[in-house]
Structure formats: C-alpha cells, structure tokens
Amino acid sequence: MQSKYGRSSLKIKNGDDTRTLRALSFSKDSVNSSSFDNEAASTTLGISTAIHASNRPFRQDEYSWNDCWMRWGQLRRVSSQLRELRFTMNDQPATVTSIAYQGTLLVAGTSSGHVLLNDWRTNDFQILKPGLSSNESVTLPVTSLAISNSKRIVCQGHAGGIIFVWDVSRKPPLQLFTINQHSEDSVLTHLVFNGNSDDVLLSTDHLGKIAVHEFYNLVINKHCTSWNLDMSKSNSLNLDSIIVDTSSISFEELHITGVKHFSFVVLQSLQSIQIVTLFPKTTLIYEFKYPAGIVSSACHSFSSSIVHKNGENTKLHAFFATAYNNNLRLYSVTFHKGYMSLQLMDRKKFAKAIWKLWWFPSSSIIIILFDDMELAFVNSMSLDIIGTSTILDKSLLRWDWYSNSLAAIGVSQTVFPFISSSLCISPRYMFVVNSETVSVGSFLMVSEQLQMLSERYGFFDSIKFGSYCVSNLSIFPKLLLEKTSVINLIMALYVKLLKSLARDFPARSPFEATSQKTNDYELEVQHLFTWTCELYSENFNTVISSFIIANSLGILPEIIEQIIPVFTRVGKVYVVLEALFDLILSQRFTNPSPQLQHHILNYLNDCKRLQDMDKLIPCIEYQSLDLDFITKFSRSKGLFDSLCYVSIYAFNDYSIPLVQFLNLLKSDIDSPSEETSINVEKGFHFLLYSLTGMKYPLGHSNNINDAYVVIHTLLKVIFSVVPLPFDVPVDNSVDFPYLRLFLEKHADDFFRCLEVAFDYPYFSLEKVTIAKKLLDTVNRQWILECISQLYEKKKSVSQSYYIFVSHVTANYSNQLLFSQSFYQGILDGLCNIDVPDDKREVVEAAIEELLTVYEHFDIATTLLSCWDHQLYQVILHISFKCGRYEDYIEAILALWKQKGQKHSFVSESSEALISLVFNNLQTINRFPGHRERYVSTLISHCGDLFAINHVCFVRNSLKYLLDDFTKVITKTFSIKSIRLQFLSLIIYEITYEQLSSWYRERTILSFLELVSFDQGDVKMLELLRLHPKLVRLQGLMEILNKNDCIESCIFVYRELAEYKLALSHVSKYIEKSMSVFDLEKSDDMTSRRIERLCLHLKTVVPLFEQCTKEVSAEDVTNFWLELVFTLLLVYIKLSLKGSINSQITFKDFQQELSLCIENLLDSFLSKTNSYKIALNTVLVRICEEASRNEHSDQYLRKLLLKLITDLYINHDITKECFLLWDMKQFYEIRSTLLQNASGVLVEDPKLQKNAKGQYTSKLKVYFSGLIEREDL
C-alpha cells in the first residue's frame, strides 16, 4: 500500500520505495483499496460521493424525491368567499378568473367583476366592487390583476378594457380612479408594475396594444397619465403579434441604493424577444430572434439583480432566461453607464415543450412549467433538473373569448391554453386558478422533504437529496433551507443506516477455531477482514461512502461517536476502524478525536501493522494529535515517520528525530534487520529534507529562519568532535562519533544527502542569526576538512567520499581552498580504487571534474593508474589536454575493443569514435606545434583506425588531412591488406587530377583490373563515368577485353571517337545478352538487363550515322546489311518464342528492336536514296533472305513493303516483289504502311492496254484494304 500523504521526489536510493503489506492492509485492486475513490462510493449509494463538488444532476426516473417538493391543496378560503359572494348577489354564479399575490396580500378576480381581497397578516377579508359611477357597477369578468411592491395599490383589468385602481391601505379600500386607455372591445391580459415602484403600470390587451400609466401623488391629487407605447419609430416587431399568455410581457426596474437606474420592457412573440427602454424615449436595446421554424411556445423570466459597486464604475448584473419550444437559454445581463449587454451563459434542450418560466425568488432555481402541467425545478448554474412536481388540478381556466382572441391574431390555442393571471407564484406558494376553485401548492422546506422521503422510501434517497441540498446552499432560498436542521436530520439517517448494516458483517466468533489452532490474533483478524472484504464488499463500500459524505457535511465525528459503541457491542468494530483508516490515509478525514486515534492505533498495533501506523499518524492534522500519547507510542514502536511528524510539526524540535536516527544507525551496524533498514532509509529522507529547508515527512517548506536553525543545529551535532548529552551509545574515545555512524555503513547515502544540501542558501552565508545571536555558519570548507581528517586515519576509504569531494570542489571551486597534496590524494584515490563496470563512468566523470580545479598532477603516474584500472575516458581527457597523443589514440583503440560490453561507453558507434579523433583537429590548431604531432600520431595508427570504420576514416581523412594525404596513402601502401581497399574508397571522393598525382598509372591499372575482375562490367562502367579521363590509360582496353567488359568498351570507344568499334561492340553486347536470357522467365534482374539493352539500342542509329559520314554508298550498303541482319537474327530469336506474348518486358524489347531496325532503314535511305544500285542490292538481299528463312519471312516482307512505300518505287523495280506475294496481299500490306494519303494508284501489268500502248485503267488501293479499278 502506498502512502497517501505524498512522498518527496528526492530519493536516497534508487530502489522502489513501495512496501508489500499483509492482506490486512488495502492493496492492489481489492474492493477495500486504500485509494478508495468516489466511484467506489457511488457503487453503493448510487450517487457520486463528491456531490458537493460535482453537483451531479438527478434523473427523474432514478430518484423518488420528485413528488416531495410541493404539497398541494384547495384554497378553501376563496371557495367560501365565492359562496358568500354568490349569496350577496342573489344566487348569481361567480368563479375565480384571475389571481395575484404579494407578501401577505392575496387578491382574486371573479367572473362577476368583483375582487376578493384577503390580508393574511390581519386575517381581513373584503370584496372590492368597482364602479364607473356611484350608481353604475361593472359586471365584466376580471381578467388581470396587479399588486404593487408596497402592497398598497391594487389594479384590476376587465374584459371591456377598463382598469380600476384601488388604495387598499385605506379602511375600507378606496377606488382612486378608472383608466379607459384601451378600447371597449379589448380584453386586458397583463397588468405589470414597474419592479419595486408604485409609480408606473404597464397594461396590454389581447389585440397587442400596450399602454403605460404613470401615477403622481396618488395620496394628494390622484393624478394619472396614460399613453400608448408607439414602436413604429424603433423599427421593432409588430405589436399585434405579441402572444397573449403569462410570459408575453414583463416590466423590470433595477435600483442602486434606492435610486431608479434603469427601466425596460420585455416583449415576447413567437418570432423573437425584444427589450425596450421607455425613458427618456422608447428605444430598442436588444433583440433575439428565434431560429427559423415553427415555434409553438415562448416565454421568459428575469432574476433579481445583483449590485456590484466599484467607485464610479458601478455595474448591475442580472440573469435572464428565455425559452422557445423545448429550448432553454440562460443569459447574464450587465448594465453599465446606461448600456445593456447580454452574454449567453448556457443552453439546454428538454424532451417537452416549455410553457412558462419563473425564477424562484432569492435563489438560483428556475421553475419550468411543461406542456403536460409538470413542474421542473432546475439548477440555474448547470441547467440540470433537481426535482419535479405535478400540478394538483390540470384543468386550468379556459374561456371561449380567450380562444376567439387567440384565433383572431392567428395564434393556435395549443400555444398556451389558459389566461395570463391564472397562475401566480411567491417565495412559499404557487396559486393555480381552474374553472371551479383555486389550487395552492406550498413549497416544502428541505427538512420536511427529507422527513417525507425517509418515511416513504427509506435512507438512501433522503441522504442523497439532503447531501445535495447542503452542498449546494447557494441555489436554494434561505426560506426553504435551514442548514442546521437538515444536517441534524441527515446525521440521524446516517446513524440509522450504519446501525442497520452492523448486523450484516461477520463477528470474530466464526474464527475462534482458527484462533485456537494458531494462537495468533493477527492472523485471525487478517483472515476475518480479508473474508469480509470479499463477501461483503458492497456493505463495506457503503460504510466508506457514508463516511465520505458525512465528512463533507462536517458530521462524521458525531456519527462515529454514536456507531462505535454499537459495532463494539456486536464485535464488529473492525469494520468502522478499517474504514476510518482508509479515510485518514487518503486525506479525506484528517482530524479524528484523540479517543478515535487511540482506537485505530491500538487496533493496528494488535494486528502488528507497524508500517500502517507509521503512515497513518502523519495523515492526521497535527493540531488534532494527542501529542503525549502519539509521542510515547511512536518512540515505543520505533515509528520513525510518526516521530518526525510529531516532533517537527507539533514541537518544532528536530533533535528528537535526529537522536532517533542516530540510534537507528547504531542498531543497523550492530544488529541489522529488515525493519531497521526501512527506518534507516526514512532517516536519510529526513536528513535530506531537513538539510534543504523542508519539513519531513510531508515535505512542507520551513520558513527561512527556522530552516537555518534546523540546518545549523543538525550540522553542529553530526560534525561534533566530542559526544553530546544525547541518549546515543557512541565511543567517547574517538573524534567525530556521530559522523562515524553515518560513514560506517551508509557513506553513499550520507554524501548524496550532503551534496544536495550544499546547494541550499545557508551554505552561501557567512553568518546566521540563531536565538538572537549572530553565529558563523557551518561552511563547506570546514565540513570537507572534518571528513578528510576522519578518513586520513582509516585504511579503507569509500569511493563515494572521493566522488563527493570531486563534485563539490568542482562546483564550488571559488569558495574552497585546499592544498595540492589534498587534491593529489583525492586523485590517487579515484585512480586506484577497484571500480565495478557499472560505476566506472561515475568515477571517470568525478576525475574529470577534479582535474578542472587541480592541474599540477603527475601525468605519467596518473595515466599509468588509469591504464591499470581501464579508465579510458580519463586517459582521453588527460592525454589530449597534456599533448600525450599516443596515449590518446591507444585509449581510443581500447575503447573500441570494449564495444558490445554491458557498460561500454562506445557501444556500437564506430563512426562516432572516428569522428571524435578527427574533430579534435578543429581545436588543436590553437596550440602551436601540436597539430603536427597529433597528425603524425594519427597517421602512425592509420591501419588500426581504418579497421574500426574504413568509410568514416577515409571521409574524415579527405576532409581534415587533405594536405597530408600523401602520408596517409604511403602508410596504407605499407599495409598490403588495405592498400587497394583504401584506393577503392578514395576514388569516389577525389578528382582525377588528385588520383593521378597520388598514384602511378600502373597502380591505377592494377586497381581497375581488380575491379573489372571482381565486380564486373557495371562497376567498371560506373568508375569510367566518374573519371572519364581514365579511358586514355595505356593498356585499359586489354584489361576490358580480357575480362569481357563490353559496356565499358563501348564507353571507351565512344569517348575515343572510335564509333565503328563502338557499334560493333553494341551488336556484340546485344547478341551476348540474348544468348544468356531465359525468355521463359521474367524477374527483376531480367527486367533491368532488358532496360540496359533498350538504352544501347537507342545508340545504334546515332553511331551508324557517325560511322557513315564520309563513306561511299557501297560501303554504307554493306555495313548497313551486316548490322541490320545481325539485329534481325536477334529479332527472329525473339519471334520464335511464343511466350513473349505474355511477357511484357520482352515484348517491349521486341518493339524497341523493331523500331531500331526501321530507324536504321530511314537513316540508310536518307544516305542512298538516289543510288539505284545500292537500293537494288538491299532489295534483292531482303528478298533472298525472306525466301531462304521462313521464320523471318513475315517481318522481312513488311520491311520490304516499307522500303517500297517510302521510296515510291515504280513497277519496274517492284516486279521482283511479286515473287513473294500475290497482288491482293501486296496491296493490302502496302496500304497499311502508307500514312499520308487515303490510297495509292498502282499500274497492273496484267491489265489491257489501249491502241497507243497505254494502260486504260489502274487499281486504286485504299489504306483500309479495299481495292477498286479506276478507269483512266
């Protein structure tokens, strides 16, 4: 189990710090893991245990508290008042048509035109009977009501467009005046007062007309001014399209310290929502248009404003919610210097259409009325539904005139099928008017909801809902949530739940038999708890989850105090203690009471879980610790981490853990054990933390003064020359008794701690103030002198000492001053200790660091020691720095011999090693005379370096040693095995001039002969193309002919302008290649050879033209015939193979060969077109060959036809051709060869002649093959 309080990233040892504990501790992936998280809690409770942080939404189908938000009933008082009204009206029926509520004042309008006035504070009831005069009363239904914020003014609107204004503060109420701003055929749907003011009233009717009424000095002169709201100049929406429902219009006014600041009207339609200011003039300040589509419902609501003051830059913030169809949008509204800005905060889409929005007074809860009369309570911060309710009576008030008015403005009745004043909401109640009476729903307090849930459904839903409410206090109105009572109720539920779970866990009794056999209490509890966690994981997770939630509510100590006696009485207290152990270890519960600390520690002690105890105590807040008990307990049990925690965090006394640490070192020397070794490792963590200004074990920073005091005190104790009055058994007869404890067995860890601590600012100071005294610091110089003084008297010295001194002296060279003998001793120690392979690199780095401050050392002795201990890196450093280049190259070679070893520096990078040798030439130029010696040494080992990586060696030699390259070549010539190999590498990197200046022709020819013999024609051709001047070497052609390098010969002859020889070798190359080809096989090698053949075929015609520039026609004819018939033999051989039809590679070559022959014919004809003897010779030779060789007959006939067609040879010359073909075949083939005309006329000797001996007709041969006679 890993500690939950977090270890520092500084590690004393490289080993894994994780401990494997017994099965009693929570380990691996068991269900009772000590890293128990919120997901495990949710497995049992069904809700995130971090609900106070995540505000997880409740799903309606998952929880059963939805019907516990409101308690519904009938408003009997209004029903009795209606009966009384009916009695006074001589049995005329009357129903409630509208309702309004403000504070304790409830008014209900009736269908008879009366208003029922109820003051719940005084329990008074009155009937307001409006009249136009003393003798004329109004009997039209009351369709809208409004109560001012002061509860002094009541306004009632009627179906005839009349508004009556009452002063209800009078006894009896006084009708102030009547307003007739609306037309007589209109129905008033809204009466809205301006926020907190009694001065301005807004009224609307079902025709979409809006009127503003301003009241002045109502008490004195009862003056009222009314005017219609004219929006024509503001280019806004058509007022006729305003929806006649409860959310059509609202009138808001925000205040700063009681002074009117901003007033605006919100106008709602099915197309958009607009915000308009009235003063000083009507102005449209914001408009939001709904997305295109059919909108069947739209509504809005404003929250109460929040005032922020900041000097003159006062800003007002409010929240605005609007809904259309099933979409809800939430805005943040800001008013600043007369300007309004809206910012979209969140949006959500519900499954049902929204009809109405209310912002719950003084809270962050939005109440939504859906189209099915369901109410949803929504958290405005996340737009998640946290509860639902259902209206008791869904048959809301419906009037025929209302439906008719909706139809008149083209609005479907499904939009909102009830009138505006049929619903009313207050902080405690919701009133709903139906056709018979008034339903009232009271919002239950959270404590009432919890009580109802626990009675109906049990613990879980009550606990979940109560936890959510307490954890989200900001969204609930204070009127409904009394935190103290809710928490007390939750605590009682938790206690009841946990007590019910106690009977489900096994007690110790089933394991008594096991205990008697083993007589081991630890093993008994281990078996018991392991078995419990396997079989009762769900119940155990429930216990932990309950503890987590209870702790988040601050009631865990009280719950534990009540349940521990219950679990103890039934022998199952181990369940509670293990759960608490898990919570404390995971830092979820950090302040257990002293009694609880005793319980848990004694339980762990009985189970002999010392490591768990040592991890548990630092997880408890030190202010809550029972210091005396914990201190004694930690000392007696040897709990090092706990003792450090108590001493440093509670007492601020570092001497206790230091003394304990020294005793641990003594114990580890005298009688080592695994437990002691673990605590010693913790002790070095303590030392490292303390010397670097941190508190152990939590890793908190000490303040700077305390850190200096701690560091100073620890160093004074550790480096004390004589024993101090501590309870540490040390030898009094030796110096530095405490330092010896560190160096006896744990020198590596001690020096590592000290080296890290040397970076702390304390060591850079000369003086520090301790106990109000200015004292000298314990500086680095003095510490090193103390350690060196101790080691001078010891025979064996730890290598970590030498490494430590090397690092420190190099890092703080400006602050340390030691003698040369001191440095020499350190250097001798580093060079002469036996170093394992895995530590050699560390020692080499330490020596290099030491040599940065110590320069006057014995070079020869040091190098000899390094050679003895194979410290090749040090040899490289010293030898190069001191100009001992022979040692340097020898060390390079020795490093290469180490390649492949486990801890080899070189590994497999030979290129890096060679590059290192040559890169030194860039820096060595700064030292006069050193370059010559270094180059000389390098050249002397040329063969060895060449063997490491010959390619890299040659490349770097040409780059850095070009001026001395003759010496390199001379050295390579002395080694026969690499002479030609060296030349084979450099020939690709140098010019021909360099090659000829460094090598004789005989050597070059020998190299070329070797290349042609070993690597063949292709490699030889590559060299000749790289260095074309090689073709002039005497004897080159003999070498090429000897090794049958035909392609190279072709290249040489072309370079020497011997075109006839080049052409003959091309023919030879083609014949040779075709003789070795397997025409039945097509692979990559064959494809590449065919490509090369095609390239050579393309050179035949240019070479032929070069050969026949100044040659007689007869010689051209003979040469042409010899060349063409050589190529024809190749073509015939390809034609004999039927497989070529399926081999694309050979088919391409055949086409290329045919094209070459035709191009040769074109070239020949261009030179001998006027020489008839040559033409006849070619013609006869082709005919003879065609007659003699049946395999070439078809191709030669086509060639002959091409010859005849291209030359337009007449009948006298073509008569020999008729020996080969019949007439029709001749003309058909010939017609296919002509490309520039539709046909040709041919004289036929078999046709009759006229009297004058002339032919009377000719044959017309078309290229399509059709033959026609044409009369002349």
UniProtKB/Swiss-Prot annotation:
Its main location: Golgi. One of its GO terms (biological process) is protein targeting to vacuole. Belongs to the VPS8 family. InterPro entries: Vps41/Vps8 (IPR045111), Vps8_C (IPR056938), Vps8_central_dom (IPR025941), WD40/YVTN_repeat-like_dom_sf (IPR015943), WD40_repeat_dom_sf (IPR036322). This is Vacuolar protein sorting-associated protein 8. It comes from Schizosaccharomyces pombe (strain 972 / ATCC 24843) (Fission yeast). WD repeats lie at residues 91-130, 137-176, 183-223. Keywords: Cytoplasm, Golgi apparatus, Protein transport, Repeat, Transport, WD repeat. PANTHER family: VACUOLAR PROTEIN SORTING VPS41, VACUOLAR PROTEIN SORTING-ASSOCIATED PROTEIN 8 HOMOLOG. The keyword Cell wall biogenesis/degradation does not apply. It comes from the Eukaryota. It is found in: Golgi apparatus; Cytoplasm. GO terms for cellular component: CORVET complex; cytoplasm; Golgi apparatus; HOPS complex; late endosome. Involved in the retention of proteins to the late-Golgi. Plays an integral role in the complex vacuolar protein sorting process. Pfam families: Beta-prop_VPS8, TPR_Vps8, Vps8_C_schizo. SUPFAM superfamilies: WD40 repeat-like. One of its GO terms (molecular function) is zinc ion binding. The keyword 4Fe-4S does not apply.
